[in-house]
């Protein structure tokens, strides 16, 4: 057998995902899944700050991509097997699970087919809603194609009892289908909900600068460092593999919810 670095999602079904993880465990081999946001310093900080906002959390995220030419062709190829909320959603659902540290219990979804160039039954816009055991809720929206709007296409925002934190992402003029821009964080804004005796805000908003961050290739290099370290130092990847299965379970439940029009209990 061989140690494996596997791009996300880990499989096209939960059963296949479990089979892959069980195989890695049985043969004592390392399996790292390409959750690139887990090695992104700005996103790691975003998760850390969100965990200090109290419970429950409200998590609002999206990544819509207005694509054309080769990028639209790539999107159509990806949609031969899975919708945008499945392909991209695993990243952001994984982030939500890290923020809440709670068990997801319910998933619902809406979606729309906005192009006749897609296979029958496929849709290129979707939005999932997930509820957690601790009362946290989150939504993730993803749409691909030449028709997609670039208004409010990069929302990364978390609200808790103690305040809210958000990522200020792409600059004006950047293309939404630019892979380098998808994980970019220009800065993180932290707002405190605490009020003083006059009923006014007790603290000013904080801006955490994220300008000095790796590009997409740099993040891919970090992923390979994680993989190499796991092999050379025999790192236990149990949680990493279980998280990959769980995030896939949520987005596939969202896909089912859209197709059936019913909320799915996990």
What are these regions (language model features)?
Residues 1-2, 72-80, 203-209:
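Short glycine/proline- and charge-enriched loop/turn segments
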Residues 1-38:
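Beta-strand-loop-alpha-helix segment that lines the small-molecule cofactor/substrate pocket
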Residues 16, 21, 26, 177, ...:
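C-terminal helix-rich "cap/oligomerization" subdomain common to oxidoreductases
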Residues 37-120, 126, 261:
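Predominantly a Rossmann-like dinucleotide-binding segment in NAD(P)-dependent oxidoreductases
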Residues 80-86, 149, 210-218:
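A short glycine-threonine-serine/GTX helix/turn-capping micro-motif
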Residues 93-180, 221-234:
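Contiguous beta-strand/loop segments that form the cofactor/metal-binding neighborhood of enzyme cores
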Residues 153-154, 163, 167-217:
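Glycine-enriched catalytic-core subsegment of oxygenase/oxidase enzymes
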């Amino acid at each position: 057998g061989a140690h494996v670095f596997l791009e996300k999602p880990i499989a096209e079904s939960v059963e296949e995902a479990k089979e892959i993880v069980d195989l890695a465990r049985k043969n004592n081999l390392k399996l790292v899944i390409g959750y690139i946001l887990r090695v992104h310093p700005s996103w790691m900080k975003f998760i850390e700050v969100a965990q200090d906002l109290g419970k429950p959390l409200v998590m609002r995220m999206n990544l819509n991509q207005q694509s054309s030419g080769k990028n639209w062709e790539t999107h159509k190829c990806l949609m031969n097997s899975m919708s945008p909320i499945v392909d991209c959603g695993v990243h952001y659902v994984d982030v939500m699970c890290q923020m809440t540290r709670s068990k997801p219990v319910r998933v619902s979804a809406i979606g729309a087919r906005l192009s006749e160039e897609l296979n029958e039954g496929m849709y290129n816009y979707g939005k999932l809603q997930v509820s957690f055991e601790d009362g946290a809720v989150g939504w993730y929206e993803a749409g691909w194609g030449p028709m997609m709007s670039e208004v409010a296409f990069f929302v990364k925002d978390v609200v808790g009892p103690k305040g809210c934190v958000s990522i200020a992402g792409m600059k004006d003029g950047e293309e939404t289908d630019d892979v380098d821009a998808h994980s970019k964080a220009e800065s993180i804004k932290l707002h405190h909900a605490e009020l003083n005796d006059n009923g006014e805000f007790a603290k000013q908003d904080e801006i955490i600068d994220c300008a000095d961050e790796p590009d997409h290739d740099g993040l891919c290099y970090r992923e390979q460092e994680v993989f190499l370290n796991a092999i050379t130092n025999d790192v236990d990847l149990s949680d990493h593999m279980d998280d990959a299965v769980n995030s896939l379970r949520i987005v596939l439940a969202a896909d089912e919810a859209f197709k059936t029009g019913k909320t799915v209990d996990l």
